[in-house]
Amino acid sequence: MIPPTDPRLVDAACAAVRGARRVTVLSGAGLSTDSGIPDFRGPNGVWTRDPAAERASTLACYLAEPEVRRAAWRNRVRWFAREPRPNDGHRAIVALERRGVLRGVVTQNVDGLHQRAGNDPSLVHEVHGSILATRCWGCGERRPMTEALERVAAGDADPPCLACGGILKSDTILFGQSLDEEVMAAALAASEDCDVLLTVGSTLSVYPAANCVPRARAAGARVVIVNGEATEMDHLAEVVLVASLSAVLPAICAA
């Protein structure tokens, strides 16, 4: 359970953002829980409740085990059936862009909700990829996820690439898979070129995305952390706020 929010910490976070000319946001799974998407490591997270699911999130396991792929496709069908929508936390970050102070959004999320809320896609750096597309592990062809899901609905439990017959996966980064170097470089650049790094909904335990925090701090940025629980980077932050993101972000970003 999230403890009562200290209004003094909310005021401190508001003041930090209010005084910034360039704000970079680093977002994690906790931002999207109010959109009905469970996080991974929280008290009710996917991997907390089912540790075996974390093993199934490795690239080696996905490529080697057809049943893991079939289960992944079933999960993707369920994910899209939820029709997740942006929440007040996502919309608060859009408000930063409309104020003209948003340097960029570095997101560990794969749900596309920042763009759907209204953020300029060119400002959103999806370091862990996107579930809205598929990519063939063989030829690299990228296609809309909806095309593959139509094939799953028609009875193909593990649809192969139509171009080469290779293994198809969501265009997301699994454990053991390299990140896109250009996307990560852009994410680090946004973190080093801001007055305030506002991290929201991340435990800051997954690298290299978590490196954005010390890189921003080393470049002179103030770090504000808002999350539903303590993070591994709290010691680097000027303000640490344990709170419901959709409840406090509108005030912080409208400062």
What name fits each language-model region?
Residues 1-255:
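Conserved catalytic core of sirtuin-type NAD+-dependent deacylases
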